[in-house]
A protein has these predicted regions:
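Nucleic-acid 5′ end/cap handling module spanning
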Residues: 220, 228, 235-238, 245, ...
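Conserved helix-loop functional segments at active or binding sites
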Residues: 53, 227, 264-268, 353
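Active-site loops and adjacent core secondary-structure elements that bind or stabilize anionic groups
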Residues: 1-199, 214-232
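C-terminal binding/interaction regions
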Residues: 72, 117, 121-122, 135-165, ...
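Flexible, glycine/charged-enriched surface loops at secondary-structure junctions
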Residues: 57-65, 164-167, 230-237, 267-279, ...
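Active-site-proximal loop/turn and secondary-structure-junction residues that shape catalytic pockets
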Residues: 70, 125, 237-240, 248, ...
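Glycine- and Gly-Pro-enriched alpha-helical subdomains that act as flexible
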Residues: 72-112, 242-342
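Gly-rich Lys/Arg/Thr-decorated short loops/hinges at beta-loop-alpha junctions or inter-strand turns
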Residues: 23-35, 109-115, 189-208, 285-307, ...
């Protein structure tokens, strides 16, 4: 099959719509269930590239959670801690495969943004992963294969309409890309730049300490950024993106946005949050929304009399600004990557407030000296990669 007709394009008025191979060859995908749309396929093909490259670079099962052609989260398949299981709504005794852990962690980066996501898996989808997907609000998944049990589980989701796409893992795209804008065709070479540990050798700070986990985190961050709409900044810890700032015109706004998301991720581990007593049978999205409001400055919206009873069995104590600040100050060992250079040291100042100890960015600012001096002030290890990673 070299063409697949779609219901419409980005919006219902944009018809006709299809995906096809210009050279007349067969599409490298098979739709096993559902009817994916135009944006679904944009998410699918971008997210597949991300997880394929992350698996190749780390030799670990990798997953991503995409919304509107940018990752809400991405991660490698490391085991979940007891706290991870609690904040990601996983049963304590659940038997999880590495690829299931990868997706649970990817979705856990920003569960609000992952609502209605497109999932991407580097490895064959098994029953453990399918069962977790089934419990979440998700639009579809792309993977190189599915076990029979996993496929049957996924076919029961969304009243049988869940989108399941299988991609040929050996497919190699053409070296040139084309895109039409306003009737004008753009051409460029594919971004085949390989991101691996060799990219991390130019350490420009006084502190040269770069443990193996930090190298993995830098790779996870940079590959995530490679498929994030620019400008973009990504915070990572233990092989998991914990804050992705995408599509901002200002670098510092990217760093702030991603940093706030990283802070929100960490606040979900605060003892007061872990101790919240939710009403029985609360839906996962409602629980996610409640946690988000509770940890924000708008906490009164959910703790007001006559309101909190809809969500909690017992009225929670306020998580004060002082408590939040003190908790976030205990965060450490975080890595941050940027798809282009930090123009000033203010990005480093903001990043270190979210526990950043390691930075990977291209370098090349006329104020690199100021950026390096700021990193040195806090004992941060920073690599200049020399490679910009814009994505549009």
């Amino acid at each position: 099959m070299n063409e697949l007709e779609l219901k419409y394009g980005c919006n219902p008025n944009q018809k006709p719509s299809r995906i096809f191979m210009k050279d007349g060859s067969d599409l490298p995908i098979t739709v096993l269930n559902g009817k994916p749309g135009y944006i679904n396929f944009l998410d699918a093909f971008n997210s597949w590239q991300l997880v394929r490259e992350m698996k190749a670079a780390t030799d670990l099962p990798s997953a991503a959670s995409f919304k509107h052609v940018s990752p809400a989260g991405a991660a490698v398949g490391l085991p979940l801690s007891d706290v991870d299981k609690k904040i990601y709504f996983v049963d304590e005794d659940a038997e999880l495969s590495p690829i299931a852990c990868a997706y649970i962690r990817a979705r856990g980066a920003d569960r609000l943004c992952s609502y209605g996501d497109w999932a991407a898996l580097s490895d064959i989808c098994d029953a453990a992963t399918a069962n977790y997907l089934k419990a979440e609000v998700s639009d579809g998944v792309i993977a190189p294969g599915y076990t029979d049990e996993a496929l049957e589980i996924l076919k029961t989701k969304k009243k049988g309409g869940y989108n399941v796409v299988q991609i040929d893992p050996d497919y190699v795209p053409a070296p040139q890309e084309y895109k039409d804008v306003f009737g004008i065709t753009f051409q460029q070479g594919r971004n085949n730049f390989k991101i691996d540990e060799e990219l991390l050798t130019n350490i420009v700070t006084e502190n040269h300490d770069l443990p193996q986990q930090a190298k993995i985190d830098m790779i996870v961050s940079l590959i995530t950024l490679k498929y994030t709409q620019s400008n973009s900044v990504c915070y990572v810890k233990d092989g998991q993106a914990i804050g992705v700032g995408a599509g901002q015109q200002s670098r510092i706004h990217c760093t702030r946005l991603a940093g706030q998301k990283a802070d929100n991720w960490y606040l979900r581990q605060h003892p007061k949050v872990l101790g919240l007593q939710f009403v029985d049978n609360i839906r996962r999205p409602d629980r996610d929304n409640a946690i988000d409001v509770y940890t924000s400055d708008e906490y009164e919206d959910i703790l007001a009399d006559g309101v909190w009873q809809n969500t909690f069995k017992v009225k929670p104590e306020i998580l004060t600004a002082e408590e939040k600040k003190a908790w976030i100050a205990t965060q450490s060992g975080v890595t941050v990557g940027s798809d282009a250079f930090f123009p000033f040291g203010d990005n480093v100042e903001r990043a270190r407030k979210s526990g950043v100890q390691y930075i990977a960015e291209p370098g090349g600012s006329i104020r690199d000296d100021h950026v390096i001096a700021t990193a040195n002030k806090y004992g941060i290890t920073m690599c200049f990669t020399g490679m910009r990673l814009f994505h549009h």
